Amino acid sequence: MTVATEKTPHKSSSMFKLFSNKLRGNNDSTPAAAPAPVPTKKLTKAHTSAHISRSASTNTPHPLRNGVTGIPSASPAPRQMTRRSTGVTPTMVKSSKQLSTLTAHNSNPFRNKNGTISSASHTHNGPTNSQHMVYNPYGINNRPTETQSSVRGSSYSRHGSGSHISSGSASSTNNNTDLSFYMHDGDNKIRMLPLPIADPNEFLPDDIKQVSIHLSDNFSFDKDNKTIGSGGSSEVRIVRSNYRSKDVYALKKLNMIYDETPEKFYKRCSKEFIIAKQLSNNIHITSTFYLVKVPTTIYTTRGWGFIMELGSKDLFQLMEKSGWKNVPLHEKFCLFKQVAQGVKFCHDNGIAHRDLKPENVLLSKDGVCKLTDFGISDWYHKENEDGTIEVKQNAGMIGSPPYAPPEVMYWDAKKKYPTSMQKPYDPLKLDCYSLGIIFITLINNIIPFFESCNMDPKFREYENSYNNFIRYQNKNFRQKGTYKPGPGSEYMLARRFKNADASRVAWRLADPDPETRYTMEDLFNDPWFQSVETCVDVNDVNLVRHPQIKKTSSEGINLVNAADAHPIPSPMVGTDTNGGLHSDSENPAGTHTTEESVETPKPASIRELHKPRSMVDIAESPMKKAATTPLFTLDEEAKEERDHEQETNTTAEADNEKAQTVPTSAVDTNEFASKENATTTDNDNVNTKATTADPTTQQGAEITETGSIAGSISASISASITASMSGSVSGAATAPIPRRDPSNRSIHSNATSTGTAGRKKKVVHHHMEVPGSAFQI
C-alpha cells in the first residue's frame, strides 16, 4: 500500500484545500491591493466614438498585487491575481466527497446571476440574429440592444443615449431637427436657408437687377476646391468662368448667423451687395459683380453668394511675413496712402466702413490696395425734418479690437462699463481711428495692444505716452491746423517711423479722444501726407475684367424686356457702367454682341419656363444640352486670346508713339519753336507757323505711311501736339505741359504702373521686382 501510494498520490480533501489556498496567493498573510474603481457610465463630450465602442471589461485596467498598473490586454501571473478580471466572484472548489456527479465540475464561472452568458462583443455595426433592425433613412442604426448595453455600460442604454451617441451617426433618439446636423457632420452652428431660396432681384433696386441669378449658369468651382478664407458669416472659394478658364473670381458664400431669420438674412446680404456694388468703380475698392444663388454641392450648402474680384493676398498676410521689417519705409507709406484713399472714397459716397483692419485690405497682383468686406458698413447720412443732413450717430459694439476706438469699446458687454459711459459715436471717426491703428501696425510690424480700453495695460501705456507728449513737448499737438513734429524715438510706438511728421499723422489718427481726432479732411490737408508718393493714381481706371454672362436664369428672363427701358445699361450683359473693362473687350459701351447678348424670348416660351418640370425632363436635360450646345474648342480660345493681345498691343503702341512725340519739358518746346522760326517767313502769326511747319506733323505723316498706326490716331496726335506747342510758344517759356484728361486715359497698362503710358508717374514702385520688397518675402 505504501509503494502504491508513492506511485499514485492520493488526492484527498486536504490536498484540494491546499491547492485552493495556493491559488488565492497568500491572501491571509499579505493584504490584497485595493480593487480598481469602477468607471463611471456617464460620457463627456470630449470622448469620441472610438472610446464608446470599447467594452467595460477590456477597458478597465487590472490592479496587480504589487500596485503596478498593468496593460489592460496583458494577463497577470496566477500568483499575482487578487480578483478575476471578469468581475465575477470566484466559486469555491469543493471536495470530491461533496460532489454528487461529475457535471458539477463543469460549471461556467463567467455566467452572471441570471444564469445566462453574455454574447461576445463584435466590431461590425450590423444587427445580430437576436436583434431587430430598426429602419433609419440615413443608414443602419448603430444603437446596441439591451443585452449589449448590459455589457458595454449604461452609456448605450435606451435612457439618455441620444446625448452620448457620436455626431457621425443618426439615432432615432436624437431630437435635433436641424438639417444642418446631417449636412455638416453634426455641426449645427452652420444653418441653411429653407427652400425655396429667394430671388435676389426681389431685394435689389431696378438699376442693378440681374439677368442671371444662378451660380451654375456661368461659373463653376475650381478643381482644387480650396477655401481661401472663412469667417463667422461667410466663406470664400475660387470659381472660374464657364467660357474662359483663365478668368478666376472669388465666391463669397454667405451664411446665416446666430438666430437670424431668413428674412433678416436676405436684407443683410442685399444691403452689403448694394453698398459694395455702389463703390466698385474705384481702383481702391474690391469690385463686386453679381449676387447669385448657390446650390447645395459637395463643396458648400445652398444660399446666397457674391461674385467678386480675386485678390492676391491681404495686408495682414503681408505684414506677418518675417521679412516685412526689411521693407523700405517709402513702400509702407505708399500702401498706407492707398488704404486712406479707399477710405476717403467710401466717405465721399456717404458710406462708413466700420470694420477697417488689415484682413479687410486686399492686394492685387500689381500691388494695389483694395478695401473689401462691407458686411457691417452703413450709410451715415441722416436727413432731419427741416431738410438738413447730418452724420447719423451709432450705438453698440461694432468693429474688431484693437481697431475699434475707446468710445466703441464702452459698449462691449463683457467689459461691464457703466451706462453713463456708453454714448453715441461718429462712425466716420471710428474709421479714422482704425486707419491710425493700421498705420501703426504697418510700421511697427506688431499690434500695439489687444483692445483700445483702459483694461488693457498696453493701451494705458499708450494713452499715458500720448498725454505726456502733449504736456511736456507739444502742448498744441491736438489743435486743428498745427503741423509741428510728432513724437520721436523716445516713444515705443513712434520709434520705427524715423520721421516725426509721419508719427504725427499716425498719432493724430489714433487719438483716444474722438473730439480732437484727425478727420479724413484733416489727413488729406496734412503736408506730410500730401508729399507721400504712390505707385498708383487714385483716378486710374480699375483694370478688372468683368465676367462673361451668356446664360440667363428662368427668373431673370422677364428682365430682358425691361433692360431696354432703363437708361443705364445693365452691367450683367457685358456693359461696364463703372468705367472698367467689358466682359468682351471688343464691345463698345452700350452695345452687345450676338455672343453675349440675351435674345428676348417669346411670351409662349416664358410661360413654359414657369411650368413645373417633370422627372423625365430633368433626367433628359443633360442629354439635350449636350446635343444642342457646341463645345468650346481650343482653336476658339486661342483665337480669342490672339485678338485680345493684338488689340492690347495696338493701343499700347499708340500710347507709346504719342508719349514720344509730345514734348516733356520747356526745353523741348523751345527747341521745336526755334526750328519753326528758322523754316518759316511769317513772324506775325505764331499759330500759323506751328500749323504749317510742324516737324511733329511730318513725323506723324511718316508713321502713317509706314502703317504703324491708323490715320485717325495720327491725326489726333498731330492736333494735340499742335495745340500744345501753340500754347507753349505763345505763353511763358517755362509753362508745363498740361496733363491729359483722366477720362481719356488708356485702360491698358503694365504691371508696374497702373497709370497711362502717356503721363509720367511721380514714382514707380516695382513691388514684384524690388529686392526686399513686400512681395518678394
Swiss-Prot record:
Domain Protein kinase: 222-529
Binding site for ATP: I228, G229, S230, G231, G232, S233, S234, E235, V236, K252
Record bears the keyword Plastid: no
Root EC class: transferase
Compositionally skewed regions (Polar residues) per UniProt: 50-61, 83-133, 575-592, 648-672, 744-756
Catalytic activity, reaction form: L-seryl-[protein] + ATP = O-phospho-L-seryl-[protein] + ADP + H(+); L-threonyl-[protein] + ATP = O-phospho-L-threonyl-[protein] + ADP + H(+)
Residue spans of biased composition, Low complexity class: 30-41, 149-172, 677-694
Region of interest (Disordered), residue spans: 21-174, 564-705, 728-764
Entry keyword set: ATP-binding, Kinase, Nucleotide-binding, Serine/threonine-protein kinase, Transferase
An annotated Gene Ontology molecular function: ATP binding
Pfam families: Pkinase (PF00069)
InterPro entries registered for this protein in UniProt: Kinase-like_dom_sf, Prot_kinase_dom, Protein_kinase_ATP_BS, Ser/Thr_kinase_AS
S-S bridge residues: none
The EC number(s) this enzyme carries: 2.7.11.1
Active site (UniProt): D355 (proton acceptor)
Tree of life domain: Eukaryota
Family classification: Belongs to the protein kinase superfamily. Ser/Thr protein kinase family.
The protein, known as: Serine/threonine-protein kinase PTK2
Species for this entry: Candida glabrata (strain ATCC 2001 / BCRC 20586 / JCM 3761 / NBRC 0622 / NRRL Y-65 / CBS 138)
Gene (name only): PTK2
